[in-house]
């Protein structure tokens, strides 16, 4: 499987444009493409929403947007829309994509007070424009750190690395002799106590240690504290990201993964750099975060080759470990990609 994955990713350099492997595999990824979704790198809300709805109905095989959403969740759920807002409004998860989700959920009968747009830091959400969106639509916008962390729900790896605790971490400032002090990453109360379903929406953006700021990177590091011990270290990320996402309070609640591929940023992430970005005008839909993140790695490698930019290491071990935990499929022969008409 790993040889097949490496070969598939390597083929990106030989292609003139992104043409994912078309198969009848066990995993479906739906790609929705539109024309002129961006104007001077800013999304056209109406066009983005139309393409999003086309992709959603195609992925769920439903005849209506309402039917699509109700096939994934119920109006009694509390839905958390996990965004990646750190890069800002242009390069991070885009407000227009999330607005399309909120409009669809509300039209399907979900009350606005049962919708939460969230990320790790409230300040990042505000800068990225989600605070304003929340005010306009009447939905909550919340930071995982500001909500506090749950002492009863945590990640403790088999071979823990003691973290350098900082302000905001649950155990910061404690001076007791607890053997496990700094070895746990506690899940935010926002996740463990305030939502029943999660929709993950990530940009198509590189990250040097993880390869891509994808669904594993965004959900894992956005949901728990004491993450400095993993960040920037490819080996530690390869273990921690899949294991955190495998926590039932996280992985079992995700009903949809959406990759915001309106732009592809192949260098500089997680900061936003338009000079390292190309327009893709696409949204990708799937249940499998492994397949989507592997697909993102391939696309970013392709962009670097097309632009004669030196290739960056891709952290394949994340997805090897994720497959071992049965979180998804990385074998390209088992990833079927459908393009909406």
What residue spans do the PLM features occupy?
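Extended, low-polarity segments enriched in aliphatic/aromatic residues
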Residues: 15-75, 86-88, 92-99, 106-341
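Bacterial Sec-dependent signal peptides at the C-terminal "C-region" and cleavage site
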Residues: 8-16
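Bacterial N-terminal signal peptides
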Residues: 1-8
